[in-house]
């Protein structure tokens, strides 16, 4: 067993324009091949698009979208006696936010081709804030799975 003490968890940094940690988390998930300036450009264009379309504060739309997509429970595969069970597990808020961001970006990448990523992301965020879209569908599907496998909750 290690004699070292557990490392302090670093607080997430905030982005330069909105000064928000959530925006920075989103940028770090958009990031591909180390091109952070491109990731920032994509997100800020998406935010500008949201501002123009909804005439609301884009940060509040982003928060609402992430709050709507964040799951409370998820299922984990657990092997017991030769068979695998999908065991429902409650998740912490930070883990839930990370999942929500991942689902939002996945849903926006899967949107029909033709427009750029900023456009797709802005529309996915607006849909999620309204309560529909593929990311919301993914959350509901996860909750349904957890509800269906509630009988296996004691395997935790």
UniProtKB/Swiss-Prot annotation:
Q: Does the keyword Glycoprotein apply?
A: no
| SUPFAM superfamilies in the cross-refs | Ribosomal protein S7
Q: Which terms are listed as keywords in the entry?
A: Chloroplast, Plastid, Ribonucleoprotein, Ribosomal protein, RNA-binding, rRNA-binding
* GO CC annotation terms, alphabetical: chloroplast; small ribosomal subunit
Per the record, the GO terms for biological process are: translation
Protein location: Plastid, Chloroplast
Name the Pfam families for this protein. Ribosomal_S7
Q: Name one GO molecular function term.
A: structural constituent of ribosome
**Segments forming a coiled coil:** none
Q: What does this protein do?
A: One of the primary rRNA binding proteins, it binds directly to 16S rRNA where it nucleates assembly of the head domain of the 30S subunit.
User: Which HAMAP family is this protein grouped with?
Assistant: Ribosomal_uS7_B
Q: Describe the family membership recorded for this protein in Swiss-Prot or TrEMBL.
A: Belongs to the universal ribosomal protein uS7 family.
Q: How does it assemble?
A: Part of the 30S ribosomal subunit.
Q: What is the protein name for this chain?
A: Small ribosomal subunit protein uS7cz/uS7cy
Q: Which gene encodes it?
A: rps7-A
């Amino acid at each position: 067993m290690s004699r070292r003490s557990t490392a302090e968890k670093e607080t997430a940094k905030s982005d330069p324009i909105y000064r928000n940690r959530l925006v920075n988390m989103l940028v770090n998930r958009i990031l591909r091949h180390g091109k952070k300036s491109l990731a920032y450009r994509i997100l800020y264009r998406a935010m500008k698009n949201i501002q123009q379309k909804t005439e609301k504060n884009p940060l509040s739309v982003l928060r609402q979208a992430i709050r709507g997509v964040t799951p409370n429970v998820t299922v984990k595969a657990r092997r017991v006696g030769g068979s695998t069970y999908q065991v429902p597990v409650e998740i912490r808020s930070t883990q839930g936010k990370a999942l929500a961001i991942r689902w939002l970006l996945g849903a926006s990448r899967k949107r029909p081709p033709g427009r750029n990523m900023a456009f797709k992301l802005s529309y996915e965020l607006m849909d999620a804030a309204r309560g529909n879209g593929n990311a919301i569908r993914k959350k509901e599907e996860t909750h349904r799975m957890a509800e269906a496998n509630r009988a296996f909750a004691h395997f935790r």
